Amino acid sequence: MTAVDPHAARARHRPWPRRCPGIALDLGSARTRAWMPGHGLLFDVPTVTFGDGPLHPIRRGVIVDTPGTARMLDRLLGHRLPRLGRPLVILAAPVLGGMAFRTEARTAAEALRPQSVLTVPAARAVAEAAGTDLGRPLLVADIGAHVTDVVLLIDGTVADARRTAVGTGDIDRSAPPARITEAVIAMVSAILDDTPQTRGALRRGILLAGGGALRPDLTYRLTEQLQAPVRPVPAPHTAAVRGAAALLQSVHGHPSVATPASGDSPHPH
């Protein structure tokens, strides 16, 4: 018997506006989220697909089944879009997902018949959701279910980034998050060694997003061991998609806030 996700059920019965100006997406390894400006969160559901191919089309921040991802998006959104509407889609893309992630994500999003597909670095989207001053260097740690990223933003642009394939799904809920804490500290230290501006960003404090930010013990351990403020973003699990939606509203007037899915990305270290 197949379990029914309550969020998906609510999304199916939620009314949609007649016009569809745009949709923000966050394609995570564990959860997929969509947000429409002026309408709010459309759904927050498990990243799963059905039919041929893997059950989980995205694994540890990598799209391993593009057709499956497309089917998932069509199942969740396709039949709900206005027949004559072609949405502008913006994707919160992992900074170190590279060209491959953006290209595969854009291909999958074509299932929605978009007028255009744009991407924005997930860390930038998180900062937007938090309403953070981007005029100063900022460290963002995004702790997901299977991947953790630490990103240094300077003037709102990605200056350096690190990734490790570990997340909250790799540890027991009742166990201390030592593995994740050690990974974040190692990544912050590596960026600090390479980029001098990291020191100022660390004094300012780390912005914490993703499901890991919902664990107070993780915030406490990072604050204690880094000797720096660590601030969870409000509703951290939806921060990336909310920030992408905020940027979506200014794309028409200021297209530089998001880049085409074929654009360059920082090189992984």
Feature-to-residue mapping (PLM):
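Nucleotide/phosphate-binding catalytic cleft detector across ATP-hydrolyzing
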Residues: 1-140, 157-208, 212-269
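Short, glycine/acidic-enriched loop or turn micro-motifs at the edges of active sites
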Residues: 29, 145-146
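Internal active-site segments that recognize and position negatively charged phosphoryl groups
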Residues: 139, 147-148
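Amphipathic beta-strand/beta-sheet edge segments enriched in Tyr/Trp
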Residues: 150-153
